[in-house]
Amino acid sequence: MPKGFLVKRNKKAALVSYRIRTDEDGGPTPECPIAQIALSSPAPSASKPDSILLAFPSAGAEAPVPVHKPVQFGNPEAVYQALYSPTRPVSKDHDRKYFERSLNLGSPISAESFPTPASLTSLDHHLLFAPVDLKIGTSNSNRSGTASGAHAPAIQTGAKRPSADAAERKVSSKSAKKPKAIRKLNFEDEVTTSPVLGLKIKEGPVDLKPRPSSGGTNKPLGEFICQLCKEEYSDPFSLAQHKCSRIVRVEYRCPECEKVFSCPANLASHRRWHKPRVQSAPKQALQPAKPFPEELRAEFPSDRDTPSPGLSESGSEDGLYDCQHCGKRFKRQAYLRKHILGHQALQNQILGEAFRSAESPDAMPSEDRQSPAPLNLSPADCLTCPACGEKLPNRASLERHLRLLHDDAQAFPCKFCPATFYSSPGLTRHINKCHPTENRQVILLQMPVRNAC
């Protein structure tokens, strides 16, 4: 903002205390002639401005230089004619008009507000002409604070314009922050070692000999070059079909189901499905069961005459796993294994009861004494499961069997073997796998016989 920007430029401007800032710090400060006139001569009359103007240069030359800078009153334009604005007039007539305006106290407002220096007492003179800075923190205020340290303490505040040292400090701090932004843009290590991509880039061989630059006409334009192995191609299609030798596919294979993953986190979450929750086993299961004699196992054939196929690791055609005992379907192989363990526990329990009843036939009731074999033999007094047709020795075993294995499900028995399934697709898959020849014969028998022509 230029100097004197907010000064009102009317004809009857009130006198304002003003201190002009100089550019050179060590140079002497020009003195205000109005203050010298107020100190050395009586109050001038408004009718003699010419005598004041004539006495102005002699008074400035003969007056002694005070210790502290005199206070400048009035409009600064009336004292200094060489201001920074290029449009300001600098003629003597202009100075004369401003001196007349500044010394003319004919107005009652200005006469009451600012009396002449001759009418002031010594105390009023010290109070009125005390050194006051209107601009805090400038170079003049610093010099006046050192010169008049006995009157008032120096006011130290931040400068309005930053110094050269502060500017240099800002530039150096900005230049020091630039390497941090450059360091954030380095993502090469993350790309080459990221496990989520499933790829790994091997380190390239160090070529001590530079590649010879072929100056022939068959040299490609350099647009289709593999950035890893530096092989050049004539068209983008060849570059797209190129399999770089530095790119290696990383595979993480599940040891239980041989499923392949490209990320180790996915493999870890997949392996949690293979670990079923450990349920609280009953007290009877905690006790070690007695081994079933091999003679009884040989005497008791399987409940199915046809051999059952083993469990397929990949599951069925629609991605489900079927239980060969009851025909239930499961989405995961771990669920099927857990379900089969329940079958085995129940079968071991029934075999144990049969073994104990065979050892002590006198303790058994008469109805159970006639049917020592609960699973494979089918005497008239054995209880048959209505869902799967399994033979059970007593009612308690039948109720336990129904509670554990059957939840009011519809049974689909096989026509060729005693196996029973609880879904029509399960029975169809069983017939296609275990009885393909019998199924073909049935189809042929159901076809109508054509008469020969």
From Swiss-Prot:
InterPro entries: INSM1/2 (IPR042972), Znf_C2H2_sf (IPR036236), Znf_C2H2_type (IPR013087). Residues 162-171 have a biased composition (Basic and acidic residues). Its main location: nucleus. GO terms for cellular component: nucleus; transcription repressor complex. The keyword Repeat applies. Residues 140-179, 298-318 are annotated as: Disordered. It comes from the Eukaryota. Residues 1-20 are annotated as: SNAG domain. Keywords: Developmental protein, Differentiation, DNA-binding, Metal-binding, Neurogenesis, Nucleus, Repeat, Transcription, Transcription regulation, Zinc, Zinc-finger. It is found in: Nucleus. Gene3D superfamilies: Classic Zinc Finger (3.30.160.60). PANTHER family: INSULINOMA-ASSOCIATED 1, INSULINOMA-ASSOCIATED PROTEIN 1. May act as a transcriptional regulator. May play a role in neurogenesis and neuroendocrine cell differentiation during embryonic development. Belongs to the INSM1 family. This is Insulinoma-associated protein 1b. It comes from Danio rerio (Zebrafish).
